[in-house]
UniProtKB/Swiss-Prot annotation:
It is found in: Cell membrane. InterPro entries: STRA6-like. It comes from Pongo abelii. The gene is STRA6. Functions as a retinol transporter. Accepts all-trans retinol from the extracellular retinol-binding protein RBP4, facilitates retinol transport across the cell membrane, and then transfers retinol to the cytoplasmic retinol-binding protein RBP1. Retinol uptake is enhanced by LRAT, an enzyme that converts retinol to all-trans retinyl esters, the storage forms of vitamin A. Residues 235-293 are annotated as: Interaction with RBP1. This is Receptor for retinol uptake STRA6.
Amino acid sequence: MSSQPAGNQTSPGPTEDYSYGSWYIDEPQGGEELQPEGEVPSCHTSIPPSLYHACLASLSILVLLLLAMLVRRRQLWPDCVRGRPGLPSPVDFLAGDRPQAVPAAVFVVLFSSLCLLLPDEDPLPFLTLASAPSQDGKTEAPRGAWKILGLFYYAALCYPLAACATAGHTAAHLLGSTLSWAHLGVQVWQRAECPQVPKIYKYYSLLASLPLLLGLGFLSLWYPVQLVRSFSCRTGAGSKGLQSSYSEEYLRNLLCRKKLGSSSHTSKHGFLSWAWVCLRHCIYTPQPGFRLPLKLVLSATLTGTAIYQVALLLLVGMVPNIQKVRAGVTTDVSYLLAGFGIVLSEDKQEVVELVKHHLWALEVCYISALVLSCSLTFLVLMRSLVTHRTNLRALHRGAALDSSPLHRSPHPSRRAIFCWMSFSAYQTAFICLGLLVQQIIFFLGTTALAFLVLMPVLHGRNLLLFRSLESSWPFWLTLALAVILQSMAAHWVFLETHDGHPQLTNRRVLYAATFLLFPLNVLVGAMVATWRVLLSALYNAIHLGQMDLSLLPPRAATLDPGYYTYRNFLKIEVSQSHPAMTAFCSLLLQARSLLPRTMAAPQDSLRPGEEDEGMQLLQTKDSMAKGARPRANRGRARWGLAYTLLHNPTLQVFRKTALLGANGAQP
């Protein structure tokens, strides 16, 4: 009974194993994990990132301490000759004569580091982020709190990079050169050893770090150049203080007579002149005698960096996945579509080609929407710079941009200071969110246009939109006729002109038509309301990053946080860094410093500690100033008159030497 028939016995040879473990022939042997095709393996540098960051953090702290020894606080200790060590300022935001390229580069480095922090698993690399192992044996650590600490860490790490430029000392330039080269060397070393990473996209880390490398490269070149200049000239570059070319250029441009363009030139080149005027109103072009404040320069630089970073993230997060899906389409997709009742063709290979073609069209729509979003955001940025310049010039002249009594006061307030501090950060966040919203809207619009209009017309199939229009054409024709007939009747029947004044006529017919067409106008109003919603959404999405424009009506403009921040930002900028006020304070301080030392050589620049003193010079309230106010006011008025008469170009032709020279007489 236990024996089996001979026919069921197999021939001698290698026995076949039908166990479950041998069913998957692609399973790696020996417990090895098979790397999926196209996936980038994890890359580890020869030197761990924790050591990199520990060295950079230590070097930054050392540089900050040395800078604190160089920068002395004379205000709190006026009797002490050497002063007390103080924390150096990273950026002089309200100093209009400082170099603007270094703060812009530092902020680009900081923002790019924060963008790389988002997908990073170790926000603080020099700390061990480990927790108790989970049930599957893998360690899991909460990353949210560490990422928040990472925000402060990278800001503190970039602090000495910016502070070395404001110290105005040869040793500070040497420290800045060392620190910038250390940062650049670490970044280049990491990207050279691990150009590909498995996060988001294999080249995302390399592409996202390009602004970071550009900013560090600029700093690593700028600091050595300033160091060489300081050794050659024996003066720290960038320490001119208030006496600089910008204030003088602003006053010169303000006092000189404006030249009027000839009408013949305009008529001869009418189209070119009109195009140039339109270009100047839409795109920012530098003009002599005016320089944008540092905060606006930082906002523009961060906006460009944010456009690049967000566009890169949207591009590498979507396009490679679409390409992988298109490359992996097989004939099985026909069964998947048939399950949803979609039959593209009886031929399975033709279905594969159609699906690949549709995926390619989807990729084209996505890239087109991204290009359109970036272009519109960049144009809005250029238009905003023109508006900033116009508003600042108006405020410099003493004009008011709105009728609100809150913004008429020139004095700073607590809310205004807070808005000034957060302006550049708000601008960057608005640009990022606005670009994301624009990408969604434009992608949906281009996809609907491609799949409902263009591709059905080209291929002659899937005419869903045209079939729906064919079935509902009486409805749309009725609405169109109602609109056209009312417009024609309003122009030819219900309106006539008497003595050059238009007047209503045929009022009975007008009342009857209004009553009878009310149901149709309700339907037309529904279509108009839909169009209004779409148009307002598109307009607000495009102008979301434009803080100088309120997205709310004028009566509710103060409820717009972006517009409110912008108005208070302008108040602080105009009240604290007016170029004319800066120039006059500089001249007064020079006269005050040269008064007790008549025989001494004139100074070419002011000490860095005298800038705040000059800002408060016109606002002194001591008893001696109150007693000598009439005499001081009279002397100040005479000095202003003399300065104007000497430096006004329009009055030079009326001087004695010029008149004698014109008459041919000897002076």
